[in-house]
Amino acid sequence: LTGRTNVGKTWIGEYFATMAWNMGYKILMYSGEMSTAMVGFRFDTLNKHFSNMGLLNGSGTLGKKPDTDGAKYLQEDYEKYITQLQQKSGFIVVTPDDFEGRKPNVDEIKSLAIKHGADMIVIDQLSLMSDKRRADIPRIAYNNISEDLFLMSKELKKPVLLMAQANREAVKNRKKGESPELHDL
């Protein structure tokens, strides 16, 4: 998934991961920007429709309950949900903190995918991964990482969903009504 800044790439990627997890698939998600708590709040919003703003702000009301006449989710509903959620596993989130504060390379993600038996790997995002071949030019590094992810996907026979942020040039082009191009990564 490629898009400009703040257009919802992570939301879309995590939505796909959450839906796959609900179908019984094991997910490995690398989040290069957000903490596990932030990813978790988004998961709770996508999985059970809790208000993301309510979770972030510590609000007493956490959104409308689906299939009701306007009933609201409350803190005790969230606590009950968390207790039930602990009975199910298989959604692993890793961040740079899990790699001693640095960007992981594809081999490290692959090792975790094998270790946890992941059925789907989500990478958020390309620019927050490390190129094990250590290319100096970002475009070449991104090409190397993309190639390594493709080969990992092929070897493990598992889908990889990769988010990539378009650069500043893409933002300028947006003002002209143009879509991001591959060279805008």
Identify the function of each model-found stretch:
Residues 8:
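Conserved glycine(s) of the Walker
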Residues 42, 73-76, 140-185:
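Phosphate-binding/switch region of NTP-binding enzymes
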Residues 23-116, 131:
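Cytosolic-facing regulatory segments adjacent to core modules
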Residues 12-16:
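Hydrophobic positions on the alpha1 helix immediately C-terminal to the Walker A/P-loop
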Residues 128:
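Residues immediately C-terminal
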Residues 2:
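Residues at the beta-strand->loop junction immediately N-terminal to the Walker
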Residues 5:
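The conserved Walker
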